Amino acid sequence: MTEPITVPTPQQIIEPAVAGRTETMVLNMGPHHPSTHGVLRLVLELDGEVVVNVAPDVGYLHTGIEKTMESKTYQKAVVLTDRMDYLAPLSNNLCYALAVEKLLDVEIPERAQIARVLLTELQRISSHLVWLGTHALDLAAMSVFLYAFREREQILDIFELVSGARMMTSYFRIGGLAYDLPSDFIPTVEQFLAVMPSRIDEYEDLLTANPLWLERTVGVGVIDAQSAIALGLTGANLRATGVAYDVRKAMPYSGYETYSFEIPVGKNGDIYDRYRVRIAEMRQSVKIVQQATERLRELGPGPVVTSNRKVAPPPKREITESMESLIHHFKLWTEGFKPPRGDAYVSIESPRGILGCYVVSDGSPKPWRVHFRAPSFINLQSLAHMAKGRMVADLVALIASLDPVLGEVDR
């Protein structure tokens, strides 16, 4: 005869509280959570609603991009870089292209250099608009989300005009650009520049002095400059602590040393300062785009790809007239070029911080190794430092303020 099933009472299950003793609990936040979108899991240790520790668990969006690039020719690998930081694909294209160009020691035409700067700064604005809209939405400010995506739509229209794609553009090539800018490119950019400064003013009117925004961001997620440097923070997250470090100024590339712009910095290293820094960065990017647009207009038509025929294919007109040029074009795209044995490292200022690319060549048409220094991966490691002692409700705002893109974290 079986024993009867007995159900324990709540008093038997719950251990009575002991005076002076507290216990922490471990909970999962994500990956199935509105703020993590299925791609990030946070293991939280909580004392009530107070965060004791945070352990990010990544890998939910792993794509193996770095390994896949080893099986592609150098030029074909460009398309894979779009998929890392998918909110700033042009920055990924540029970093990889600069590293391979350094390996090849090729010169880039001035028109291509200016176009690269112009488009990556538009990309920076676009990325910051996504951050601003989603960050505000996480804190229940839906109007800002709608307004920010209104301007982002204009930028994506410009990318579509240039490359035919709104996000995965693959427009930059090793040696220059895929093809020249369209004739209506400059007028379209100028239309955007005419309205963008006033739009940024609108965002600030809605948020900068908003009491609810201030309550959720001022003094929350604080990190000092010394800790930020020790943890490897870069980009707006570092500059919000008062450190005026920007690769575009410290180690200029693509002619950035010839442009006039400032490095916005914060003081307190909290969520609010990270917000103010990114807003100011959008204004500086508008300033750079204006200068680049003027230079393109003054420069006029010209080549947008290197004249080195070991790297770049012959012009289209030659392919239709010369069998040798047709064969050259075919072999260059099917077999690829062969850089000399060696390695090269290049870092740029992406919207999320320092993006680095390390390329190793063994003399074959395919890279022996490609490694990216992804700023989002490093910035995420600071989450525990900033979250300790804060309420669980602050975590959503804190994650958003770091602006991570899990595509480059799990590359």
From Swiss-Prot:
E.C. no: 7.1.1.-
Catalytic reactions of this protein: a quinone + NADH + 5 H(+)(in) = a quinol + NAD(+) + 4 H(+)(out)
Subcellular location(s) per record: Cell membrane
Pfam family of the protein (one): Complex1_49kDa
Membrane topology: Peripheral membrane protein
Gene3D superfamilies associated with the record: Cytochrome-c3 Hydrogenase, chain B
Gene Ontology, cellular component aspect: plasma membrane
Keyword entries, A-Z: Cell membrane, Membrane, NAD, Quinone, Translocase, Transport, Ubiquinone
One MF annotation (Gene Ontology) recorded for this entry: quinone binding
Main subcellular location: membrane
Function summary: NDH-1 shuttles electrons from NADH, via FMN and iron-sulfur (Fe-S) centers, to quinones in the respiratory chain. The immediate electron acceptor for the enzyme in this species is believed to be ubiquinone. Couples the redox reaction to proton translocation (for every two electrons transferred, four hydrogen ions are translocated across the cytoplasmic membrane), and thus conserves the redox energy in a proton gradient.
Subunit structure: NDH-1 is composed of 14 different subunits. Subunits NuoB, C, D, E, F, and G constitute the peripheral sector of the complex.
Family: Belongs to the complex I 49 kDa subunit family.
The name this protein goes by in its record: NADH-quinone oxidoreductase subunit D 2
UniProt source species: Chloroflexus aurantiacus (strain ATCC 29366 / DSM 635 / J-10-fl)
GN (gene name): nuoD2
